[in-house]
Amino acid sequence: MLAAFVTIKVKPGSEADFEKTAKELVAKVQASEPGCKLYELSRSDQPHTYHFMERYVDQDAVATHRATEHYKSLGRQMGQYMDGAPVIIRLTEV
């Protein structure tokens, strides 16, 4: 299994718009990507900060995820609300 822990900071005042778009992405991933075993959005206790927790069966599932139209289009939409680049920690199960 492969996993990612992604931290995203959003511009103040854009939280609701970011959440709406991110929740749409979560729903589409969960409904259509069998190789993705976990795709979850959480709000941090830090202001304007969110985390995605992702878990995939293998590298092919990660590649499939990144190639989907919903990832590309909704990812672009989320970008307008972000305050800087996301911080991505990639993990491999031992």
PLM features per residue range, with description:
Residues 13, 47, 69, 73:
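Short alpha-helical
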Residues 2, 40-48, 75-94:
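Glycine-rich beta-strand-turn "strand-cap" elements at beta-sheet edges
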Residues 2-32:
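N-terminal first-folded block
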